[in-house]
C-alpha cells in the first residue's frame, strides 16, 4: 500500500475527532438514547444484524462500520429478537425500518425503494440500496477521509467515494436485491467468483453437522474489509494519479503527431482509458484519440488502440489487418517498418523496439483508414 494510504490507516488506529460530511443530502441527527441500562452506557457500542445465513451486504456494512473509530470495538449482535435489536446502537439489514436519525438501516421492507440517486440528488446510480449501500451512503465520506488521512472537503474524497461505489459497493447492492446484470437477453457467461458469491460460500453447507454461522460471518467481514481496502488503495495510488499523466499526454498530443490522434504516456501500465474518455469531452479543438504509445516493463514500445468503450474488445481504429497475428521479421516485411515485435490477432495492440517505430505503426494505420467518421465517446449518452 502507498505511504499516504498507510498514514490514513494509522489515523484510523489513532482516531482523530470525527468530522461531519458536507456531501450528504441527508444529515445524520444525534442517535436516540440507547435502551441499554444506564450501567451499560460505557460499554462498547453494539451493531445489530440478523443471525442465520449471512450475505455480502451486511458483512460489508458491519466491516465498514468497524473501520470507523466510534465502532472499531463494537460488538456484533446477530439476532432477529426485536428487544435485543432495540438495545443496539446501530442496526443493519434487519428490523424492517430505515431511519438514519436512529441509525436503523434495513432495506427489506416493502416501502423501501431508495437508491443512491434518490437519497443523494445528483448521483447517477439507480440501483436499489442494500444495507451495504446505506452504510456507505451515510458514512462513506467520513470513512474515506479517515482512511486517506485527509479531510472530507478534499476533492479526492468525493472522487474516490463515487469510484468506490460504482466499482465495489453497487455490485453488492444489486446482487443482494436480485437485480439482473442484463436488462434483456441471456448473459453470455456466469459470474461465480463475485465478492457476494465468495461470502455466500462461507456459510455452512446444508449437510454440515455444525450449522453455526458466527465464525463464518467473522471471516466474511475480514474478506470484504480487505477487498474494500485493497480497492481503495488502488484507486488512490494508481487510478487517480494516472489522470495527471493522461492530462499531460493530451496537452502534448500535437507535439507527438500533427494529427492530434496519438498520445504518448510518460509511464506504461497506468489505468488510462476511463480518464481519456472523460478528458476528451473537454478537448479544444474537439477530437478523439486513436492510439496510445508507451513503454512496457522491458523498455520496449507499445502502440495500443483506444477501444470504443472502456471494457470493449473493439477498437476505434485497429492496427492494419495484414499485420495482425504476425511477429518479428514477418511483420517487418509486410509493414515496411523494421524493428516490429508483434501485432495482436485482433489488431488492438502492437509492439516495437523503438518509439519512432511505434509511432510509424500508428501513423501508417491512420494513413490507410477509410474516410474519417468521428468516433463516439462512451461518456456521452
Swiss-Prot record:
<keyword id="KW-0539">Nucleus</keyword>
<keyword id="KW-0378">Hydrolase</keyword>
<keyword id="KW-0597">Phosphoprotein</keyword>
<dbReference type="GO" id="GO:0005739">
    <property type="term" value="C:mitochondrion"/>
</dbReference>
<protein>
    <recommendedName>
        <fullName>MYG1 exonuclease</fullName>
        <ecNumber>3.1.-.-</ecNumber>
    </recommendedName>
</protein>
<keyword id="KW-0496">Mitochondrion</keyword>
<dbReference type="GO" id="GO:0004518">
    <property type="term" value="F:nuclease activity"/>
</dbReference>
<dbReference type="InterPro" id="IPR003226">
    <property type="entry name" value="MYG1_exonuclease"/>
</dbReference>
<keyword id="KW-0007">Acetylation</keyword>
<keyword id="KW-0540">Nuclease</keyword>
<dbReference type="GO" id="GO:0005634">
    <property type="term" value="C:nucleus"/>
</dbReference>
<comment type="similarity">
    <text>Belongs to the MYG1 family.</text>
</comment>
<keyword id="KW-0809">Transit peptide</keyword>
<dbReference type="GO" id="GO:0005737">
    <property type="term" value="C:cytoplasm"/>
</dbReference>
<feature type="modified residue" description="Phosphoserine">
    <location>
        <position position="120"/>
    </location>
</feature>
<comment type="function">
    <text>3'-5' RNA exonuclease which cleaves in situ on specific transcripts in both nucleus and mitochondrion. Involved in regulating spatially segregated organellar RNA processing, acts as a coordinator of nucleo-mitochondrial crosstalk. In nucleolus, processes pre-ribosomal RNA involved in ribosome assembly and alters cytoplasmic translation. In mitochondrial matrix, processes 3'-termini of the mito-ribosomal and messenger RNAs and controls translation of mitochondrial proteins.</text>
</comment>
<dbReference type="Pfam" id="PF03690">
    <property type="entry name" value="MYG1_exonuc"/>
</dbReference>
<feature type="modified residue" description="N6-acetyllysine">
    <location>
        <position position="267"/>
    </location>
</feature>
<dbReference type="GO" id="GO:0005759">
    <property type="term" value="C:mitochondrial matrix"/>
</dbReference>
<dbReference type="GO" id="GO:0005654">
    <property type="term" value="C:nucleoplasm"/>
</dbReference>
<feature type="transit peptide" description="Mitochondrion">
    <location>
        <begin position="1"/>
        <end position="47"/>
    </location>
</feature>
<dbReference type="GO" id="GO:0005730">
    <property type="term" value="C:nucleolus"/>
</dbReference>
<feature type="modified residue" description="N6-acetyllysine">
    <location>
        <position position="273"/>
    </location>
</feature>
